[in-house]
Amino acid sequence: MRHRAFAVLVAGSVLAGLFLARPALGQYREYYILGKVVDPQKQPLEGVEITLRDEATSRGYSMKTKKDGTFKFAGLPHGVYKVAFKKDGFAVKEDEWKFTEPQLNIQKVEIPPVVLASEELIQQTNRLKEAEAAVKGAAEKIRQGDFDGALAGLKGVLDKNPKDPNALYLSGVAHLKKGQPAEAAPEFLKVTELSPKFAPAHYQLGVCQEQMKEPDKALESYAKAMELDPGNPDSPYNAGLILFGMNRVDDALPLFEKSLALRPDDPAAQEMAGRCYIHQANFAKAVEYLEKAKAGYAKDAEKVKFLDDLIAKLKEQIKK
C-alpha cells in the first residue's frame, strides 16, 4: 500500500508541476504595442483601421487610431504579423511586424510614426513619375534628332498638365529645331512665366523672336538671359548681331567683346568685333581681330580667302 500511495503521490506531484508550469509555457499576452498614424504633413489621422494577422496561426487583431492619431494594443502574442492601415481616401499601407521572441513579462514596443498618403497624392506622384519618364525620353529623342518623336511623347504630358515647364521647354526646343519658331515661341514664353529665373527659356525665346523678325523683343529676351546667366557667351553674341544689323555698331561692339571674354577663341565673335572696328575706322584693331578669326576658320578655305582679302584691303588703308 505504501508503494501505491507513493505512486499516487508521485503522479499527483507531476500533475501539479504540469499545472503550475502551464501559465509560463502558455504565456501569450507578451507585447504592448503603441504608435501614431499621420499624413505627409505630419498631421494626426483619426479613425485609421489597423488589422494584424499572425502568419503562423492566422489569428487576427484590430484597432483604430484615436483623435490624436495614436493607437495601442496590450497583450499581443509573439509572432510575425502582416499589418494593414486603412482609411477612406487614403492609400492602404501594409507592413510586417516581427515579434518572434516569447516574453515572460509584457514588453513595450513603440512603432515609428506611420505615414498614410492620400489617394490623390499617390495619383499625383504617379503622374509626376510618368511625366518625368516621358520628358526624359523626349530629351533623348531630341539628342537623336527625332523631333517628331519627341513632340509625340510630350503631347501626352502637356494634355494632362499644360503647365509642365519641362515638357513645354523641350517641346519648344523640338519645334525650333524643326524650323518652327512661331510654334516654339509661345511655349518658351509660357516657361518664362512659370519659371521666370530659368535663363535658357529666355535665350530660346530670343532666338525665336530673332527668327520671326522681332528684333526689339529678341533684344529684351537676350538681355534677360544675360542677367540670369552672365556666363553664357551666346546671349551677348546674338544680341550684338541684332544691333549690328540695325546699324547700332557702337552698341554691338561691347557685346561681341563680352562674348569673347567668355569664349576667347570664337572666330565668329572675333570677326564681328573686327567688322565693328572697321565701321569705326579703327583699321589696325580690325586687322587684329580678323587675323584671330582667320586662324579659327582654318578649315574653311572660302572663309579664309575672304578674310585674307579683307585684311589686305585694310592694311592698304592703314598705309594711306
Predicted segments with their positions:
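Structural motif
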Residues: L34-L45, I142-R143
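Alpha-helical segment of the N-proximal tetratricopeptide repeat
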Residues: R127-N166, L170-E183
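A short, solvent-exposed beta-strand micro-motif common in secreted/extracellular proteins
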Residues: G69, G79-G89
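Short, acidic Ser/Thr/Gly-rich low-complexity loop/linker segments typical of extracellular
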Residues: E55-T70
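Canonical tetratricopeptide repeat
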Residues: L170, Q204, N238, M272, ...
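Structured interaction patches on ligand/partner-binding surfaces of diverse proteins
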Residues: D88-I111
